[in-house]
Swiss-Prot record:
Its EC number is 5.3.1.16. InterPro entries: Aldolase_TIM (IPR013785), His_biosynth (IPR006062), HisA_bact_arch (IPR006063), Isoase_HisA-like (IPR044524), Isoase_HisA-like_bact (IPR023016), RibuloseP-bd_barrel (IPR011060). This is 1-(5-phosphoribosyl)-5-[(5-phosphoribosylamino)methylideneamino] imidazole-4-carboxamide isomerase. One of its GO terms (cellular component) is cytoplasm. Pfam families: His_biosynth.
Length: 238
């Protein structure tokens, strides 16, 4: 089932939106993450996408209690600073459904493959794309892998992928359609799309080319998109 998923980015105990993931470029802030999560679920969200930005910038999980509370409300996928498999298992203990791995997916391929075999269906590989190459370490470094090359290292396992185009992340400027279509159609496993989604048509496009869902942040928090409208695409024939 195609899912429209609100993003909840946590930084210093608050929900924030950052322009292109830059720590000092905050475009939205709310002080109560639990209330924000509750509002999305009440409107109809079945899945929530939670990123521990403090964790991503500092390399360790920082919002355990908030994440545990949110995990009681809906299906939850969590990422940000998860560079240790024990942390991932701790998240599963807290009730998290899927854990998102970024840097580890590039630097520790064999270990993550083994972990994914142990936790079938619960590993999500982040494919963060910057000008057609994969970015790691809080999007600060770019490696010589294309998004599809990274995904192919895991596509024979029971995993899912999160494809984020950093070039348009947080800009509410629309998506890069050819790149999304290429990634989705190259892979066997479910691909969720994030970065730049700013219209109902962007969501419909992702569904039409076979994405498993979309993650939306800035467009919802800046009110460019109404979640009540966006979620209807889950049930549309496109």
């Amino acid at each position: 089932m195609f899912r429209v998923i609100p993003a909840i980015d946590l930084k210093d105990g608050k929900v924030v939106r950052l322009r292109q993931g830059k720590e000092d470029e905050v475009t939205f802030e709310a002080t109560n993450p639990i209330e924000v999560a509750k509002q999305w679920v009440e409107i109809g969200a079945k899945v929530l996408h939670v990123i521990d930005l403090s964790g991503a910038f500092q390399g360790r999980l920082r919002h355990e209690e908030i994440i545990a509370e949110i995990a009681k409300m809906a299906e939850v996928q969590v990422g940000g600073g998860i560079r240790d498999f024990r942390v991932a298992e701790r998240l599963f203990e807290l009730g998290v459904d899927r854990v998102i791995f970024g840097t580890i997916a590039v630097e520790r391929v064999e270990e993550l493959r083994e972990f994914a075999k142990k936790w079938k269906g619960r590993v999500m590989v982040a494919i963060d794309s910057k000008k057609g190459r994969v970015a790691v370490k809080g999007w600060k470094e770019v490696v010589e892998l294309t998004p599809v090359q990274l995904a192919e290292l895991y596509d024979d396992l029971d995993v899912s992928f999160l494809y984020t185009n950093i070039d348009v992340e947080g800009l509410v400027s629309g998506i890069e359609r050819e790149r999304i279509e290429e990634v989705v159609k190259s892979l066997r496993n479910p691909v969720y799309v994030a970065g730049g989604i700013s219209s109902i048509e962007d969501i419909r496009f992702a569904k039409r080319v076979g994405a498993a869902g979309v993650v939306i942040g800035s467009a919802l928090y800046t009110k460019k998109l109404k979640f009540e409208e966006a979620i209807k695409v889950e049930y549309e024939k496109v």
